[in-house]
UniProtKB/Swiss-Prot annotation:
Disulfide bond annotation, renumbered to this chain: none
Transmembrane stretches, start-end: none
Pfam families: Pertactin (PF03212)
InterPro entries xrefs: Autotransporter_pectin_lyase_C (IPR012332), Pectin_lyase_fold/virulence (IPR011050), Pertactin_central (IPR004899)
Protein species of origin: Escherichia coli O157:H7
Gene: ycgV
Designated name of the protein: Putative uncharacterized protein YcgV
Amino acid sequence: MGIKQHNGNTKADRLAELKIRSPSIQLIKFGAIGLNAILFSPLLIAADTGSQYGTNITINDGDRITGDTADPSGNLYGVMTPAGNTPGNINLGNDVTVNVNDASGYAKGIIIQGKNSSLTANRLTVDVVGQTSAIGINLIGDYTHADLGTGSTIKSNDDGIIIGHSSTLTATQFTIENSNGIGLTINDYGTSVDLGSGSKIKTDGSTGVYIGGLNGNNANGAARFTATDLTIDVQGYSAMGINVQKNSVVDLGTNSSIKTSGDNAHGLWSFGQVSANALTVDVTGAAANGVEVRGGTTTIGADSHISSAQGGGLVTSGSDATINFSGTAAQRNSIFSGGSYGASAQTATAVINMQNTDITVDRNGSLALGLWALSGGRITGDSLAITGAAGARGIYAMTNSQIDLTSDLVIDMSTPDQMAIATQHDDGYAASRINASGRMLINGSVLSKGGLINLDMHPGSVWTGSSLSDNVNGGKLDVAMNNSVWNVTSNSNLDTLALSHSTVDFASHGSTAGTFTTLNVENLSGNSTFIMRADVVGEGNGVKPWA
């Protein structure tokens, strides 16, 4: 400490300048009494140390560990506990750094091998680089527990963290940055990871999170992964955001986001149980689906948004695969697809249930489907809005599938000639079914080709388009309209048209002058108004209502 006194004043009644040259000195108070107000605390200096091995390891705050010792396989490590039944107790304090750079082998950051071991740290940094491979943290021992506190970071040029054998890991505001390997791997029955709030996983070349309760003792229960406000950002071919295998439970809390940017890199791929609210999924690669469920149930709540630039939005395909995608009136969900479909159920026990959801499909003029059920799949929707660009079809069912829609339904195709609702006949399959009941605003045509379509239009419905029923395979098209309007745009036929205080308008959107629009109905009932263009003034431009 140096004290500079001005004007030759050597008394301690004036402290003009105090220069503190040691971090161990804390200035509490300036005053005329001089130096008795200065508190001296013990000096703690961060130390550099080499690899740590043993069952009880305690590292001081701020220390730096550099891997300089090889394990029996000849690979450098930072911290390691012995294998076996002796528990390890590893306390890495606050702000400790573990660096391992193995220029010729497998770099290992922290390896916990003993049964019932514990690892404790806060604001830990692990940075590993290996020539052949690398792992930031590997919890190998049975029933190990790791608490990484707040703000810890794992960096690796291969795998980030691997945990298994019914072990647990907790952290918050946690960061994993890695390349080539998986960011976080959760193996075995009973293994669980809770990343708290605000954690981030960024990988280049592989999957962000893999979880699978596929081995070990099933009495320990499912493998579990929990986080909220989680960000996953992955790049690379087939690099999925989250890969959920059987016997796994994932809870993504609220405001989590998943982004992938590789071909076939699905945002969420699941055989397990997944839940999330206000989830955002954005995938940009070719054939990359936003959410693909192959088994189990995935439940996604309000204010969730799925976007797939070149693939499907939601898809179920597999045994008892279910997606519940539920927005609310105040917080609607959305799906955008620049690929094949917005939502698709593709096998006999595959189901998608949606509420309060807006679906947009735009494949730049190529075929795309808003809702697509096939091979016995089923889709239900309540209060849906579907927008289809040129080349798209709104709702489509084939190969013995079913779609059921209730409440408000909006289908807005780019022209009335495009298919808003349609079924397809396929030899050897029972007729597919599409049922809709509620207030409908439909811009597009309805075509029953070897299928059964039943539309029950509630008051305020408006349909602009044409209809077709080919009656193949027992197919039918039945429409009931109550205080609704059908603007017929071209020649149409259907099996049943039941009208109550409604209007069928051939004039406003019909064929051009000089041509006729024909409507064939097998069973017509009710009391409503037909508006037709008639040649009552000599030039074919007269419009006359018929009751």
